[in-house]
Curated annotation (Swiss-Prot):
Protein encoded by which gene: psbM
Residue stretches in coiled coil: none
Broad class of the protein's primary localization: membrane
Family: Belongs to the PsbM family.
Record InterPro entries: PSII_PsbM, PSII_PsbM_sf
Membrane topology: Single-pass membrane protein
Known role: One of the components of the core complex of photosystem II (PSII). PSII is a light-driven water:plastoquinone oxidoreductase that uses light energy to abstract electrons from H(2)O, generating O(2) and a proton gradient subsequently used for ATP formation. It consists of a core antenna complex that captures photons, and an electron transfer chain that converts photonic excitation into a charge separation. This subunit is found at the monomer-monomer interface.
Source organism of the structure: Prochlorococcus marinus (strain MIT 9312)
TM annotation in the entry: 7-27
Name this protein carries in UniProt: Photosystem II reaction center protein M
SUPFAM superfamilies named among the record's database cross-references: Photosystem II reaction center protein M, PsbM
Complex formation: PSII is composed of 1 copy each of membrane proteins PsbA, PsbB, PsbC, PsbD, PsbE, PsbF, PsbH, PsbI, PsbJ, PsbK, PsbL, PsbM, PsbT, PsbX, PsbY, Psb30/Ycf12, peripheral proteins PsbO, CyanoQ (PsbQ), PsbU, PsbV and a large number of cofactors. It forms dimeric complexes.
Pfam families in alphabetical order: PsbM
Subcellular location: Cellular thylakoid membrane
């Protein structure tokens, strides 16, 4: 019981966290310019601007 429950929670986090991150990144890029998705993600979206 405990091992299956832990595996279910682990798999849920493993799938859910990147999905939420990608959805948030997609929404943040949709807020700005749609055409500059790749340039924004490679420049200052993932890290702090210096």
């Amino acid at each position: 019981m405990e091992t299956t429950n832990f595996g279910f929670i682990a798999s849920l986090l493993f799938v859910g966290v990147p999905t939420i991150f990608l959805i948030g990144l997609f929404i943040s890029t949709q807020d700005g310019e749609k055409s500059s998705f790749f340039s924004d993600s490679s420049k200052g979206k993932l890290g702090p601007k210096r």
